[in-house]
């Protein structure tokens, strides 16, 4: 059960990235404040995410095959997670100006690629920690915890950073500091709640 919980906590952790960056707060910020206009912003964002999906579809199977042969699953999960978190931090520098359009799309695109690649190897571990008859329950538990994590971090970001007149840490709404700070929240959330899984990954992967 401990392995299942640690596994699910990773879902709880990484849901912050898709919820805040890809789907809600940062995508809206990009469309309204960085792109020339919201319509173009949504289009650019959608194309970027679509392209990352194609990239992952191409290189994912190749990396998967390599990982199986060289036993690199553990390494890939850790390194891709760290890269995604690091890139997410860089979104703090995405100021509300068209000058940061390409920068933001590049960072988001790369972060999403490494996020999706980490999931390929993460999902492959489930069969090692759960009996075949319980795969559905284990997967469902992980999905539910991930969904819960996304809701919680969204509420935190909205109440503390977006719809709050008294911002923490000396932040101001000038230059959208409050919105950009949510990228740091995501990175910290992702890192902190992924630690139990990452630190026990060798044991989990070896199914000891």
Regions found by a protein language model. Give the residues of each.
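Membrane-embedded alpha-helical bundles of multi-pass transporters/translocases
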Residues: 2-202, 207
């Amino acid at each position: 059960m401990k392995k299942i919980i640690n596994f699910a906590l990773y879902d709880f952790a990484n849901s912050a990235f898709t919820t805040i960056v890809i789907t809600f707060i940062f995508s809206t910020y990009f469309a309204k404040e960085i792109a020339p206009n919201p319509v173009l912003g949504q289009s650019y964002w959608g194309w970027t995410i679509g392209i990352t999906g194609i990239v992952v579809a191409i290189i994912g199977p190749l990396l998967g095959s390599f990982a199986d042969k060289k036993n690199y699953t553990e390494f890939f999960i850790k390194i891709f997670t760290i890269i995604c978190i690091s890139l997410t931090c860089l979104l703090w520098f995405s100021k509300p100006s068209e000058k940061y359009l390409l920068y933001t799309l590049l960072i988001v695109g790369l972060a999403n690629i490494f996020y999706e690649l980490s999931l390929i190897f993460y999902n492959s571990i489930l069969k090692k920690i759960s009996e075949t008859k319980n795969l559905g329950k284990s997967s469902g538990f992980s999905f539910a915890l991930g969904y819960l994590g996304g809701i919680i971090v969204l509420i935190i970001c909205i109440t503390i950073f977006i719809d709050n007149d008294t911002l923490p840490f000396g932040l101001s709404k000038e230059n959208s500091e409050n919105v950009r700070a949510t990228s740091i929240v995501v990175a910290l959330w992702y890192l902190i709640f992924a630690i139990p899984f990452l630190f026990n990954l060798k044991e989990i992967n070896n199914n000891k």
